[in-house]
Regions:
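Flexible "cap/lid" subdomain of the alpha/beta-hydrolase fold that forms the substrate-access gate
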Residues: 1-137, 156-161
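Catalytic active-site module of serine/aspartate enzymes centered on a nucleophile-bearing elbow/loop
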Residues: 131-172
Length: 172
């Protein structure tokens, strides 16, 4: 996961191919929802299968729960992705232009894609969050299911890490 503006800026070549769903769901309302609704379990199941380092890491009952939830939320899921290509980019650009940065401790945990995606997630996040802790976990996209101990440890460390700032400041 990257800041939205940075995500769209790095999508080319291999990253664009991996992120094809972003382009699909960024289209105007109607067609993306219709295409996904025609075979929602195939669409969402595809990502459950290819984004997990070990597809067995997601137990059958959890997979079913994910598919059921996604099936019922197609309009909301697509709207969220659509916003990422529009208003979210505008907001990120405005924040970047005015120097707004996250002033609280931030932990970014990413799955280990190696160098396949061609960007440095920590460097991209550091531009937004000066008090950044970055970790790479050997797993696929579904980190909570595939590496629960690592994720719980990182969350405990984040929640107990003192802030380097006396107060949270957001420029307005």
């Amino acid at each position: 996961v990257l800041p939205t503006l940075d995500m769209w800026n790095v999508l080319h070549g291999v990253t664009a191919a991996v992120g094809f769903h972003l382009y699909l769901m960024a289209q105007p309302p109607g067609l993306p929802e219709q295409m996904i609704a025609a075979a929602p379990d195939a669409f969402f199941g595809y990502f459950l299968d290819i984004w997990a380092r070990d597809p067995h890491a997601i137990p059958a009952d959890i997979r079913t729960a994910y598919l059921n939830a996604c099936r019922d939320a197609i309009p909301s899921i697509v709207a969220d992705y659509r916003a990422s290509a529009g208003i979210d980019v505008d907001h990120d650009q405005a924040d970047r232009d005015t120097g707004n940065r996250l002033q609280m401790p931030v932990t970014v945990i990413q799955q280990d894609w190696g160098t396949a995606l061609g960007y440095d997630a920590a460097a991209l996040w550091r531009a937004w969050a000066p008090d950044l802790h970055h970790a790479t976990v050997t797993c696929g996209h579904f980190m909570a299911e595939e590496a629960p101990t690592d994720i719980a440890k990182a969350l405990r460390e984040l929640l107990t890490r003192p802030t380097t700032n006396a107060e949270l400041v957001v420029k307005t």
